[in-house]
Amino acid sequence: MQIALLGLGKMGKNIAQKLLAEGHHVVVWNRSREVLEQFRNEKSEFVIKEQLHITHSIEDLRDTLQKPRLIWVMLPSGEPTERILEELRDGIVDHGDIVIDGGNANYKDTERRFKVFQAINVKYLGIGVSGGIHGLENGYPMMVGGDKSAYEYIGNILDSLAKPNGGHTYFGEGGAGHFVKMVHNGVEYGMMQAIAEGVGVLAKSPYKLNLVSVGNNWQRGSIVSSFLMWAAVSALIKDPTLAQFDGYIDAKGEGEWTVQVAKELNVPTPVIEQALEFRKRSQYDIGVQDTFVAKMVAALRHEFGGHEIHKVETKSVEEVSK
């Protein structure tokens, strides 16, 4: 199939690579020309085969793509995504085309956008994509919401991205997929915090435990075995003291949104809420930053998501609360 992918960040680049490897024809755009040219050079064999097309202009998509146009937006949530979607809506896509937002959008934004595109007869999908930087090799788990006929149409694309161990599920219209992904990330907050706290206790035990050995033991069929536990072991193998991590933990929107929605629905979420609060404190409280627990959460984020290792620029409580 032919698809345009807008955004060559960590996830977008890997998705483009996987689609090319699976034989799809991919048109890529990125705001930075340098990033585009680097990708062109890295994937020159696909350019030669005319399987990869680089475009510097969103407007080119109107004439470059076959009907129905299939455009996957993989940009940071909020303003960057909103701006590109407006460009697409105002002159690029029309009747029968399909637009996909594969970023971590707020499900309420997805619900609104679904209706806006529906009004101009463009099919809209919001797809929550998990798997981090390992999705390229392992396959992506995808949580889909929006137009069901569009989901069925792009099944071949999603099957390619899911190989070998991922998958995709349609959850309903509008923002359903991004709602499921939001809660997934909230659960992720709680699980990461629990693993980090457990490892923190082990690190201070009187038995001089080998943390990698403990983690490997727990991965052999125990109740707490998981991809996150694997990530913890992997991080500890590389840096047993986690000295390279400063204990500053970013808190993206999904954890906050999960807590907010839970309150709206009168659902208690103390574990997720405390994990979120711990992350916020790590951004200004040196006492938290210096703990093995905070360093472990930061290490987990880096290990599975490729998130940057911060050099602390301590923020005030007021800045973090904004």
Predicted feature descriptions by range:
Residues 1-69, 93-96, 133-136, 302:
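NAD(P)+-binding Rossmann beta1-loop-alpha1 motif at the extreme N-terminus of oxidoreductases
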Residues 28, 73, 99-101:
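Structural beta-sheet core signal
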Residues 1-8, 17, 22, 29-31, ...:
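NAD(P)-dependent Rossmann-like dehydrogenase/reductase catalytic/cofactor-binding core
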Residues 26, 54, 99, 124-125, ...:
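Hydrophobic beta-strand scaffold residues
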Residues 59, 71-87, 106-109:
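Beta-loop-alpha module in the N-terminal Rossmann-like domain of NAD(P)-dependent dehydrogenases
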Residues 81-84, 100, 106-197, 202, ...:
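Rossmann-fold dinucleotide-binding core
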